[in-house]
Every structure is written in C-alpha cells, then in structure tokens.
C-alpha cells in the first residue's frame, strides 16, 4: 500500500486512462540536432522519465510553423516531415513503460525573429505578433496579417496530426508564458482593430480557432491539454479573474488545464514561470486551485513541486487533480516509483 494513495489513483483525461497523477512537465532540450531532430540521447532522456514511473511524459515547446514560430535554436519543428521518425521512436520509448507520450504545440510570436539561442541560424527573420511593437533589443515586430493567422491555424492542425501519427497519446496547446496566444490574449500586447482584437472574446478568437483545428485533426476522445497562465503578473496584462473567464470560454474544447503564470522572455517574470529555490514550494498552486473552482475539467498545477507529501496534499485537498514536475524529475527520474514504494528518503 503506497503512502500516497491520491497521487497514485488513475485518472481519465478525454478517452485516455492515465495510471497516476504525476506528469512530467513540458521540457525541451538544447541538444537536439541543428534541424531539431531528437538524438538517441534525447530519446533516452524522455524514456527515463517514463521508466521512472510518470503517468505522462511531455516534450516541450515544439514549433508548429518553423518559418515564423521558432523562439530558440534547435527546437522540434513539427512542419518538418523529416522529424517524424525521431518523434515516433521517442513516443515508442515513452509508451513502452506504460506512460502516455504528450507534446507541447507552440509558436514564439513576436519573440520568434530574435537571433537564435545557440547561434545556428544567422539569417534575419521577421517577427510577427498581434500588433506592431519594438522589442527591448530594438527589433521591430510586425502585426501578424490575417493570411498568416490562418496559415498558422492550419499549422496547428497539421502539427496535431503529426503528433498523433507519431504515436503521441495527448497534445498540449501552449497559450501561456508570453508566447503567441498569450500575446494575442493580452490587452497590453494586442491593439488590433479587427476580429482578433478588442474584447477578451475577440482576443481569444485565435486560440479558440486553433483548439478547433487541433480537435479536427485528432478526433474525439483524444486528450487536448491547454497550458495557460493564471496571472501574467504584468500591469495592463491579464490577471486571475480574466483567466477564470478564459477558462470558461475554452473548457468545451479541451480535456485538461495546465495552469502556470508569468513570461519566459521577461527576466523579472521568468522566476515565477520557473520558480527558484528562493520561492516557496508550490508557489503557483493557488492559481490552479482558483481556476478549478470555475471549470469541471481536470486541472494540473506546476512550479516548484517535488515533495511527495505536498503533492499528495494538493490532490487530496482538491486544489488540483494532477501535479506536473520539471526539475524534480531532472534530479531524479525515479521519483514516482520511489514515492509509490514509500522511499521518500531515497529521492535525490
């Protein structure tokens, strides 16, 4: 009998039964090939998390539209047909241990024209966001034309289809952390005068349409997870009450919410998106708990989690249905198995 019964109770997400409530949070790697293909070492990295007992293992920030969406160098680009073999092998490596393979569909938006991290790509690419902008780097951001919006929508559907064909059992649509959909959602970023700007309903239109394209691609019952902020922590941005409203708007289109916060590309907010050791463990759980009060679909929380007792309490108390772990699983991929066996003292 495990000392953490809530943590190891199966849960059904869409038509998929997940063996426990411990998910590997989306993580990417800077060691993919220059073309964004997974190496055997990359596959082993994700496989080890599955072998260690996670219910779901997630590949992070995989780009749906390489020409306009790459925020870093060496990202998986799902519109590259040559990436399919390494994706397929990775999904097989994950699922052979009874975990579900998940992949995060993303687009960098206005941050996708910057000089790439790692320096592989030297050409200048135009950056597109909801509205014209000048970044702190001095780079000009162009307003995304409607033609490109619809091209990007097609790319989300195509990327979801690729993921399903590769053997992934779930997809995550990234709508937080300052990336494309978060930019469109934010009144601070989005000053458009067309149907994709103005009210929250209009600012959310792009996201809702993308979720519809993903559903059309994967079909009924296939789990769709949305990653969204619970608070931007930015003056003029969206806050918890706004995100409660957004959650109600998207609920019929998704099977699972992942509630995070902040922004990847703003240094003062990065610490909330990726909480350091100087912040309280589980410092963002309250956002997931608040969103859980207004929707009926399952909720996962993320950020500075790793103590099995705390994770058990989060689920037992109804604050969230699932815990997503990042650095804790990097430190010890076998954390789930050790927790199940009551070997907390052996967790790295």
Give, region by region, the residue ranges found by the protein language model:
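Flavin-dependent oxidoreductase catalytic cores
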Residues: 1-348
């Amino acid at each position: 009998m495990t000392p953490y019964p809530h943590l190891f109770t199966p849960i059904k997400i869409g038509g998929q039964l997940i063996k426990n409530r411990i998910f590997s949070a989306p993580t990417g790697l800077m060691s993919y090939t220059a073309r964004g293909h997974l190496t055997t070492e990359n596959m082993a990295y994700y496989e080890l998390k599955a072998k260690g007992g996670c219910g779901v293992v997630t590949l992070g920030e995989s780009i749906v539209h390489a020409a306009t969406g790459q925020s870093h160098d060496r990202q998986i680009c799902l519109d590259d047909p040559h990436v399919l073999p390494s994706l397929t092998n990775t999904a097989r490596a994950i699922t052979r241990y009874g975990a579900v393979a998940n992949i995060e569909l993303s687009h960098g938006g206005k941050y996708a024209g910057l000089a790439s991290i790692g320096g592989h790509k030297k050409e200048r690419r135009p950056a597109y966001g909801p509205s014209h902008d000048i970044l702190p780097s001095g780079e000009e951001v162009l307003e995304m034309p409607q033609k490109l919006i619809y091209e990007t929508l097609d790319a989300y559907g195509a990327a979801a289809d690729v993921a399903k064909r590769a053997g992934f059992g779930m997809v995550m649509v990234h709508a937080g952390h300052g990336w494309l959909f978060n930019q469109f959602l934010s009144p601070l970023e989005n000053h458009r005068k067309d149907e994709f700007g103005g009210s929250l309903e209009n600012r959310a239109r792009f996201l809702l349409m993308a979720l519809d394209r993903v559903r059309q691609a994967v079909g009924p019952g296939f789990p769709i997870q949305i990653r969204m902020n619970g608070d931007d922590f930015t003056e003029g941005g969206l806050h918890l009450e706004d995100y409660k409203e957004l959650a109600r708007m998207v609920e019929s289109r998704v099977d699972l919410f992942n509630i995070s916060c902040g922004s990847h590309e703003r240094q003062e907010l990065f610490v909330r998106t990726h909480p350091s050791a100087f912040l309280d463990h589980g410092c963002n759980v309250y956002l997931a708990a608040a969103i859980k009060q207004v929707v009926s679909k399952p909720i996962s929380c993320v950020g500075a989690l790793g103590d099995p007792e705390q994770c058990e309490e989060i689920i037992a108390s109804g604050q969230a249905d699932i815990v997503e772990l990042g650095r804790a699983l990097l430190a010890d991929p076998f954390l789930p198995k050790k927790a199940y066996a009551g070997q907390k003292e052996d967790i790295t």
